Amino acid sequence: MTFREKMPTSPKSPLRRRRSSWTGTWLNHQTTSFKQAVSAVIQAQSPRSRFKSLSSDFSDVDRTLSLSDSLLLKILEKLPESQNEDVSLVCKRWLSVQGRRLRSMKVFDWEFLLSGRLVSRFPKLTSVDLVNACFNPSSNSGILLCHTSISFHVSTDSSLNLNFVEESLLDNEMVDKGLRVLGRGSFDLIKLVVINATELGLLSLAEDCSDLQELELHKCSDNLLRGIAACENLRGLRLVGSVDGLYSSSVSDIGLTILAQGCKRLVKLELSGCEGSFDGIKAIGQCCEVLEELSICDHRMDDGWIAALSYFESLKTLLISSCRKIDSSPGPGKLLGSCPALESLQLRRCCLNDKEGMRALFKVCDGVTKVNIQDCWGLDDDSFSLAKAFRRVRFLSLEGCSILTTSGLESVILHWEELESMRVVSCKNIKDSEISAALSSLFSLLKELTWRPDTRSHLSSSLEGTGIGKRGSKFFKKR
């Protein structure tokens, strides 16, 4: 029997079955209807389908390459700040473009600056803080020393040496070298914070960064201020001389006079831990004619400096903070002038038990409209009574004045005819029960009143009826 004779002739045989077509596949499928089959055929023959097949071949192509860096930068600027780190991880180009967005930087690694990576990675920086990077890092140390804007690691042996902070600082030449590197690459620099720099470093920076407007100099000295005249466009300046427990430096009348003659366009000035006297403050007032804000922190000035404040013709805000004394011997009251444009007087964390200094200060600032006294000790009724010298107070804020009483407050504010707003917080000797009818009548005329003198009584009244703050006998009964 031949092979042909053995072939089965039954139509149901699998060898005689016709090859299935695409129509049979669609039509014979149990879950596919005829309408779905027709729709699939039409979609397969459409140009859009052919376009999809072509575009799928370019799925791995970076389409942002067709965008210029400036256009890509504008797009990335629309993203929220929370996505900045994610954007930098996309590719090297996005990392570079993202670096141009950053405007402010606090540097912790000095080698990152010296190597040039800071200015190449972030070419558009306008604000740079180098203070923390100016300290030699202590290896294998878990002790972190923090003081306001300064923080660095110290070794366990530092407690045996009282000058460990100054010894941890980079030397002057190294700091000046970093300023030269920064100046050559950061032409848009507007603000700089640095410590332990010298006159030469400041001069080199001023030559390259002509737009520098704000400068903060820690461990400042008279010699350093000799190079400040090169910063012609300086508008804001903060000088930190000595800081108790960290480092010591001297800014005397010599430095203040150099500052006054070299920075005549100053609008904002802060003197922290600086020395000086009447002559230095007077020079600033006479030369810096557009100065509007003066801050004096932890001053070490000689007596009589307050009288020089009358030479500031454009001063609008005076802030005195963290001072152990105001002025022990301000001189005769007849010789004290006043600041004609002064609007706001702020006293924070100061010792105000110096009656003569307070009397002189309030007389010089007699034209202020805003008075803010916060967390000051020594402000009793007698000291606060000197505030009657103010003639045009519209806003008063008292916070943390624990010695001042209700009668002491009342005796002063009833003399202020223009008072519109008042804020009294955490002054425990000012009692609600001691408010007189005259004081209550004054409160009703104020436009704004924040009255929380005794926070403990305020908390008790707010929790009344809630059951909170009572003894636990209700919940811990003996069974």
From Swiss-Prot:
InterPro entries: F-box-like_dom_sf (IPR036047), LRR_dom_sf (IPR032675)
Chain ranges of the F-box domain: 62-108
Region Disordered: start-end pairs: 1-20
PANTHER family noted in UniProt: F-BOX DOMAIN-CONTAINING PROTEIN, PARTNER OF PAIRED, ISOFORM B-RELATED
This protein's name: F-box protein At5g51380
Species for this entry: Arabidopsis thaliana (Mouse-ear cress)
